[in-house]
Amino acid sequence: MKDKSIKVLEFNKIQEILKNYTCTKAAKDIIEDLKPYDSMYEVREHLEETKEAFKLLITKGAPPFEGVYDIRSGISLAEKGSALLPGQLLKIAAVLRCARRFKEYINHKEEEESYRVLENICEGIFSLPKIEEEIFNAIEGEDEIADRASSTLYNIRRSLKEKNYSVRDKINSLVRSYSSYLQENIYTVRGDRYVLPVKAEHKGAVPGLVHDQSSTGATLFIEPMSLVNLNNEIKELMLKEKAEIERILTVLSAKINANITGVKTDANIVWELDFIFAKAKFASEYNCTCPTINDEGIVDIIEGRHPLIDRREVVPISVKLGEEFTSLMITGPNTGGKTVTLKTVGLIHLMAMSGLMIPARENSVISYFNNVFADIGDEQSIEQSLSTFSSHMKNIVEIMDKADENSLVLFDELGAGTDPTEGAALAISILENLRKRGTKIIATTHYSELKAYALRKEGVENASVEFDVETLRPTYRLLIGIPGKSNAFEISKRLGLPDYIIDFARENISNENIRFEELIENLQEKSIKAEEDARLAENLKLERDKEKKKYEEKLEGLQKVRDNALIDARREAKNIIKEAKEEADKILKDIRQLERMGYSSDARRKLEEERKKLKDKLDSIEEKEIKTVHEGEALKNVKEGDEVLLASINQKVIVLSKPDNKGDVLVQAGIMKITANIKDLRAAKGSNSNNSSSKIKKSKKLNLNLRRVESSVDLRGMDAEEAIYTVDKYLDEAYLGGLGEVTIVHGKGTGVLRKTIMDMLKGHSHVKKYRLGEYGEGGTGVTVVELK
């Protein structure tokens, strides 16, 4: 692929936008080197990885890239056997953790989901949890080694703490004793040694060693002789602490060195995934789709948009090439939007061949070309003393030398910059030569000769960019099959040129040319009308489908509400009666106790009667429910995916798990998952639960309306009540959205909000487990929640 064409089509600007979606410098470097791939297989594989990442973003939210760093310098030092700094080790551990969690993120999927390319990439992850754990256990911050890093360090620091207590007690006593000689009644530290701020004129009153003096010389910092031994002991312990820390860092660095292959592999995979998900985030932001790729030269871009033009202003274009025709001549006036069309086609091809999804509608088709050549814009070079024509011709000579049947060539204003007759003849000759080679061509021109060439030559098609003569602005809509007209007379008239000049100009044009231009104008009007009708029909169809979907969803929602209300009402009724029965049993027990003590049994008889009424009522409810159940005995065996009848609520449910040793199974009733006993299950009408041919896929109800659920929620600034409501609602959305792990940001502060949230999480139905954030995740300011 020619670097010049890549530059002319502004692919470098796409690279710069992509970099904004990465987390690491390493991923940015990958993007910096990104170019179209060398084979169609590579293009398809890299497009597939982008598509899979895009799907994961929609269904699972943001991937676990928290705390990902560029650790290339740390790896390089470890590879040489050098001891790493605490911060370098922490960053390596954070990347290893990210690799491990990403593998879990990919593997945590439903049965019907498949992420072939990403799963293959993640298969290469070594996962080094032991090293990761040792580093996080030993190091608490960029410059902080934990006491638990080793028993030796723990003992040294404990002794150091005791010595510091002793010396502080001693020096506080000395402060009181020498208070009249001190600048202030305090002590301070100089060079890790406790000293007193003694007035210079009283230095002889405090026997000891002078360590420093103030900038004015009025104060001397003296270490009292009685503290020298204690300070020496503290200094020795500090040296031992430093040596032990260096030993710990050396040991941890050696473990990185011993596993350097795994560390490098995991880091490289994380950076590659960072790059892949940057492509997916770009696709999400720019409403991109994954095109179909072929190597037959067939192009069908449906409503493609130039990604560098403001999305509020860009007009989609649809371009076909390679089936009915292999050359497309876009004609019309200058500033008519022809160049934008060329650049859109060229840039979309470069994006697709670089593994990027494209800003176009679904079902767009892109051909893999070995080369994309672009001669666009004024490449005039003052230094080389080349005219516009010479500059273009220099590019064209190079294109003619290298273009073949696997090339796409984009010409802007072919033949311009010289005598129109000669320029048009030369342009036709160039186009015809390339056409015979099988090269796919899109060229812009305002020469009438090229319109005629396209009309009479098989395999060449005319096209034009619609121009609004009222506003004197192009609409940028591409009309294939219709040559463009110059609109010179209309534009001149709108700009105020006198009619008599325009009329005289018309008289100097042949009748054939006038009729040709009128024919073109008529064709344009009909084409525009046909396109508007087609667009209106499409919009009506989309509106109808949207309304249909809305009412179907509303109906489904009402059905779920009804089912849930019925389940809740029945359960509540049974619970009320059951609780009343249990209360009656308790009172009866108390009355029996009173009878044994000699009290009257009248109350007991009355309560027995009430208890019997309650029992009869409960039995009656259960009997009514049983009558509504499909006749048949309780099932003895069920398996995952069976559709059965849950007798207690008289509703069809899906079996989600095998019976445990108590006979309990997990079933799904509507959107609810509940536990039932196998004795309460019956065969559903129209299904054979023991030999079901219709397997229901075990899955959460994913939020497939493409509404993205974020992987974190921020509670900072909320009071406890608002925070609890927000978290409860968020966890429901995250659970239904299929997220495996989420982060709750509550801040550090006083810890009240953190405790409130943790108390709430203890009994939440969607929560499997939770923990405080680790290094790189936000520490104690966040809580990481794993969902069921």
UniProtKB/Swiss-Prot annotation:
GO biological process, any: rescue of stalled ribosome
Sites where the protein binds ATP: G332, P333, N334, T335, G336, G337, K338, T339
Entry annotated with the keyword DNA-binding: yes
MF-aspect GO terms: ATP binding; ATP hydrolysis activity; ATP-dependent DNA damage sensor activity; endonuclease activity; mismatched DNA binding; ribosomal large subunit binding; rRNA binding
SMART domains noted in UniProt: MUTSac (SM00534), MUTSd (SM00533), SMR (SM00463)
Recorded superkingdom: Bacteria
Alphabetical list of PROSITE patterns matching this protein: DNA_MISMATCH_REPAIR_2, SMR
Role: Endonuclease that is involved in the suppression of homologous recombination and thus may have a key role in the control of bacterial genetic diversity. Acts as a ribosome collision sensor, splitting the ribosome into its 2 subunits. Detects stalled/collided 70S ribosomes which it binds and splits by an ATP-hydrolysis driven conformational change. Acts upstream of the ribosome quality control system (RQC), a ribosome-associated complex that mediates the extraction of incompletely synthesized nascent chains from stalled ribosomes and their subsequent degradation. Probably generates substrates for RQC.
HAMAP family: MutS2 (MF_00092)
Protein name: Endonuclease MutS2
Source organism per UniProt: Clostridium botulinum (strain Kyoto / Type A2)
